[in-house]
Amino acid sequence: MSVYTVKQMARLSGVSVRALHHYDAIGLLKPRAVGANGYRYYDRQDLLRLQQILFHRALETPLKDIQAALDQPGFDLAAALRAQRERLAAQAERYARLVDVVDRTLADLEGDETMDDKHLFEGFDPEKQARHEAWLVEHYGDEATRRIADAKAGMKSWGKKDWSQFQEEAKAIEHDLAKALTQGLPVDSAPVTAIMRRHWAWVGRSWNREPTPDAFAGLGHLYQANPEFTARYEAIAPGLTEYFSEAMRAFARGR
């Protein structure tokens, strides 16, 4: 049976050493053995458990729920894989629709065809947006209701190009911040501060007004508290949610 060190496990899976250490610390993925030299050693069963963790992350399952699912008595790996395949297939179908919308929107912008406005949002999940808004109102009350109304009022006049740029900038910010995380950059370093400056502007555009430092820091707390945000960021890079939140608070302190 093959045995892997934490570095070998990281290279094999694409999961960072830092994330594997974190999974060990919270009990989500303990190494099969720890040598006298302090090295962690993993076997194939650990590989399969890590694969399960990654499948759950792809399905936006919070880490605490992943651990509960994997540690339940009588856990059946084959049954879990079949259920995950069904859910991933449904997601693949939805993403295929989104790709089609992207292609048709690009064709419209480039003048190759005319796209009816009613088709702009095919493939998006209105139920998820409704859940997100309900969570905000439940946890933040009237202030959240006002913020949602302001955001919707500001976005009402957006055209296709506005939406495309807004979404692309969000992805670019997440990508660049995940890269900074993997490089081990401090949250108050110059490169991360530059990313947060872009995020500050992005949030202001979303809210239809510039955020206050307290509101920006509070949004960082929300990212950690809301399971859908957490699932999104952890799927990009393990530890990104906490890093994102800390970077936002560091930036807010400097305003």
Swiss-Prot record:
Pfam families (UniProt xref): MerR_1, TipAS
PROSITE patterns: HTH_MERR_2 (PS50937)
UniProt-listed SMART domains: HTH_MERR (SM00422)
CDD domains the UniProt entry points to: HTH_TipAL-Mta
DNA-binding region ranges: 6-25
Source superkingdom: Bacteria
InterPro entries per UniProt: DNA-bd_dom_put_sf, MerR-type_HTH_dom, MerR_fam, TipA-like_antibiotic-bd, TipAS_dom
Alphabetical keyword list: Activator, DNA-binding, Transcription, Transcription regulation
Domain (HTH merR-type) ranges: 3-72
General function of this protein: Regulates the induction of katG (catalase-peroxidase) in stationary phase.
Name the record gives this protein: HTH-type transcriptional regulator SkgA
Native species: Caulobacter vibrioides (strain ATCC 19089 / CIP 103742 / CB 15) (Caulobacter crescentus)
